[in-house]
Amino acid sequence: MSVPFYAKSETNQGYSKNMEVVGFSDLNGVNAFQMALYKTGEKYYMYCGSFKGAGVNIVDVTDPTKPEVVGCVYVSDPNIYFAQSTPKVQVADGLLIVALGGGVTFLHGIKPGDPADDGLQIYDLKEDPVHPKLLSHWHTGLPNGMGVHRFAYNGGKYVYMPAECR
């Protein structure tokens, strides 16, 4: 592992104050945005939404000194939906909830109306947290738009969200 820019080293006083970096993963070159932790048995998995991309990385963080990317949930075909963004994820009650929408022009270099799937996808983590099973996909009715961005799911029957919808 090369030393990340924020880690304390001989040539760097460190970026994180009052914390110590104990492990690092470049997530196989995929950026991450919101993350959510899931514990099952003795294993810990971190699900990482992508600010620009059609997937959610699954990282085994059971040993925090050696985080390992063990899978990815692809929410749509990146060859079709090249403007896809999956920035927000939530985990509770053995469910992974993923927000889908289009990227932002000034951040991602896409144009309004570029193809992106929309809505929320709900996955079951209980059977196999490395290969989540898609349970449902709620569509906003406005594909290629902003879709769902911030939302809250703490378990139970309801997801609370703002969405561009019809």
Where are these regions (language model features)?
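Feature marking well-ordered beta-strand scaffolds used for ligand recognition
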Residues: 1-166
